[in-house]
Amino acid sequence: MAFLNPILHLALDTHIKTILRGFGQVMLQNNALTGLMFLIGIFYNSWQMGLGAILGNIIGAVSAVLLRYPRDDIKNGLYGFNGTLVGIAVCFYFGINILTISAIIVGAFLSTYAMHIMKKRLPAFTAPFVISAWVVILGIKLLYPASAMALPLPQDGSLNLFSAVSMGFGQVMFQGNIITGLIFFAAILVNSRNAAIFALYGSLLGGLFSLLLPLPVAIINIGFFGYNGVLCGAVLGNKKSDAFLLTTLAIILSVLLYFGFYKAGITALTAPFVLATWIALSIKSIR
C-alpha cells in the first residue's frame, strides 16, 4: 500500500491549500500563504474566532463539494471565505457553544448556496456572508434573546491614526487588535503589493474622511470606518488615474453607507463595501 502514500499526501495537500485559500479570499487574495497568515492573525487575537473561522470555512467548502459546484472554484477558496466570515461573526457576537456551532454550520451552508446563485449574475464579493450572517444573527437573537455577548464600548479620546488604520485591516474579520491588523496587511503584501497599497489607502482615507462625520473619535480609532475601505481598495485599486478616482469614490461611499447603517442601528458587516463596489463597477461599465 506504500504506493498510495504520494496520492494521499497530494490529496491532503490539495485540501489544506483549498482551506487556506478560503481564508485568503476574505480579502480577495487567492494565496494559501496569505490565508495562513490571516488565520494566524485571527488566533493571535481570539482562539474562539479562530475556531469559528476554521469551522465556517470547512463547512462552506464541503457544502460546495456535496452540491457539486465547479471544482476549480472550490480549490480557489471561493466557497470558503464567506463561511469563514460567518463563523467569525457568530463567535464575535455570541461566543462559541453548541448553539453557535449549529448556527455556523447553517450560516456557512447558506453562504455557499448564496454564492453559487449570485456569482452567476454579478460579482458576489462578501454579499453571501452579509445575507447569511444577518439571517443567522437575527435567528439567534429571536430564539435566544439573552445569548448575545456584551461587547466592550470604546472610550473617547484623541485620534490615533495608527490604531485606526491598523485596526481597519483587522476589523475586516472582526479583529480589534493592532498586531492582527499589521499581520493582515503583511499577508496581503505577500500576494499583491498593489492590493496592499490600495488597501492601506482605503483604511487611511476611510479613517480620515470619517472625521468629517458626527462620530465619537474612539469608534474611528478601532477601525470601524476603515475596514470597508480596505476591501474597496484591495478590489478596485489601480494606478491609472480613472481607476484611482473610482476607488476613492468607492471608499468614501463605503464610509457614508457605514455611517447610515450605524445611525440606523443596523449591523453593517461588509455591506457598505459590497454596495459601494457594485455602484463603482456600475459607473465604470457605463463610461
Regions found by a protein language model. Give the residues of each.
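N-terminal signal-anchor module of multipass membrane proteins
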Residues: M1-Y69, M167-Q175, I179-N191, G207-L211, ...
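Alpha-helical transmembrane segments of secretory-pathway, organelle, and plasma-membrane proteins
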Residues: T34-G35, F185-L189, I197, G202-L204, ...
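Structural signature of hydrophobic alpha-helical transmembrane segments
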Residues: F43-L55, F94-V106, V165-N177, L215-G226
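Membrane-helix interface "capping/anchor" motifs
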Residues: S46-M49, L66-L78, G95-I101, M115-F125, ...
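Transmembrane alpha-helical segments of multi-pass membrane transport proteins and ion-pumping complexes
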Residues: M49, A53, N57-Y69, G87-I88, ...
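A structural feature that tracks compact, well-ordered secondary-structure segments
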Residues: A64, R68-L78, T84-F94, F184-A187, ...
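Loop-to-transmembrane alpha-helix initiation sites
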Residues: I101-S102, R121-P128, I222-Y227, A264-A276
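Long hydrophobic alpha-helical segments that form multi-pass transmembrane helix bundles
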Residues: A124-T180
